[in-house]
């Protein structure tokens, strides 16, 4: 299953370049440009470190049932850890069909309906049914092949796919896996790129773009919340880049730009916190992963940080630093007995500035 790495052989969780994350129980799986780490968030300890190459995405059901993609430059491998064995799929070994470029840039691993596994690549996206891979060729754009990067699934069995073409124009569409047909959806972010996407409990598709903010699509209409909503928007949000768009259990939407984590509640859109380190001035947030009341924050130079949506605290993950006290029994009821008011750093406060976000009884409010 790859080489078991020592601490000296792979960059630790507080220093690594994070490419993707997923969660099983209290264990956080972190894909880096060297391999992957498994970090126990309750104990604050790295359980496993594997040097398996430059990862681009990872999904997992357990330590002995996980998938990851490895970037080899002009090709990629898709790898399944099953027990003590690892099976590698690629164009080179004949497992991935579609021609010599069908696994180039593989990323966006996702679990789909009926225990299927999906990933995107240059010109194709692929589905694994437990026995073999099926490749789907995307409709031709005006600029050649589409590089598919993101997948989302609704309760009706629809697969939503998004990517870019050769001129970095975005494509977003609805895919019917039964008919094997994709229907592109016209959108005003077609000259942008999609970097994140998910489906909420009401089957709305949420889409994070590189430069145009984030959208909700209800099957007929797009809403751009960076420009079309009536939310109070923090003056510190000076960009419409939305990295890692996701939803916390309380319904709030989160995304990142540069070093900042942004919270959108419907009434306000504010910077909830920042990841700063004077020794790493070029550090930036690369991805987010929501789990219970926590948002895990991956960065390019300082590893993983954890944002607590109840207290507003951000903690850098490191060996010896537990960040989650009971993640396997996450309390989704945010009601507290105390009426104290806290700012987003978790400090009790009485002095609220206009436009400041604060927490009372476990709920966030915007001070108009």
Predicted regions and their residues:
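Sec-dependent, cleavable N-terminal signal peptides
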Residues: 1-9
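Short coil-to-beta transitions that initiate beta-strands within beta-rich domains
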Residues: 9-24, 48-63, 90-113, 137-156, ...
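Residue-level detector of functionally pivotal "anchor" positions at catalytic/ligand-binding pockets or at interdomain
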Residues: 310-347
């Amino acid at each position: 299953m790859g080489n078991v790495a020592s601490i000296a052989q792979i960059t630790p969780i507080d220093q690594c370049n994070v490419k993707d994350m997923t969660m099983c129980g209290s264990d956080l799986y972190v894909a880096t440009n060297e391999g992957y780490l498994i970090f126990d968030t309750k104990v604050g300890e790295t359980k496993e470190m594997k040097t398996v190459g430059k990862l681009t995405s990872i999904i997992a059901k357990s330590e002995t049932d996980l998938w990851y993609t490895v970037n080899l430059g002009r090709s990629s491998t898709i790898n399944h850890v099953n027990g003590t064995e690892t099976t590698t799929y690629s164009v080179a070994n004949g497992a991935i069909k579609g021609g010599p470029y069908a696994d180039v840039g593989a990323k966006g691993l996702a679990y789909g309906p009926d225990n299927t596994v999906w990933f995107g690549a240059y010109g194709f996206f692929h589905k694994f049914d437990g026995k073999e891979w099926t490749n789907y060729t995307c409709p031709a754009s005006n600029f050649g092949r589409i590089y598919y990067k993101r997948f989302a699934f609704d309760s009706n069995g629809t697969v939503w796919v998004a990517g870019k073409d050769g001129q970095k124009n975005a494509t977003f569409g609805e895919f019917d896996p039964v008919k094997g047909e994709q229907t592109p959806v016209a959108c005003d972010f077609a000259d942008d790129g999609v970097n994140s996407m998910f489906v909420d409990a009401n089957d709305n598709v949420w889409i994070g773009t590189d430069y145009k903010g984030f959208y909700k699509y209800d099957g007929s209409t797009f809403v751009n919340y960076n420009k079309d909503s009536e939310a109070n928007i923090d003056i510190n949000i000076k960009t419409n880049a939305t990295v890692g768009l996701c939803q916390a259990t309380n319904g709030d939407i989160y995304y990142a730009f540069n070093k900042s984590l942004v919270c959108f509640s419907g009434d306000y859109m504010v910077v909830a916190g920042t990841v700063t380190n004077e020794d790493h001035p070029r550090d930036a947030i690369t991805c987010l992963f929501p789990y219970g009341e926590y948002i895990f924050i991956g960065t390019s130079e300082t590893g993983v940080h954890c944002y607590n949506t109840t207290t507003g605290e951000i903690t850098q993950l490191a060996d010896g630093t537990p960040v989650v006290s009971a993640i396997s029994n996450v309390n989704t009821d945010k009601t507290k007995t105390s009426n104290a008011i806290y700012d987003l750093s978790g400090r009790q406060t009485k002095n609220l500035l206009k436009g400041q976000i604060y927490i009372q009884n476990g709920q966030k409010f915007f001070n108009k």
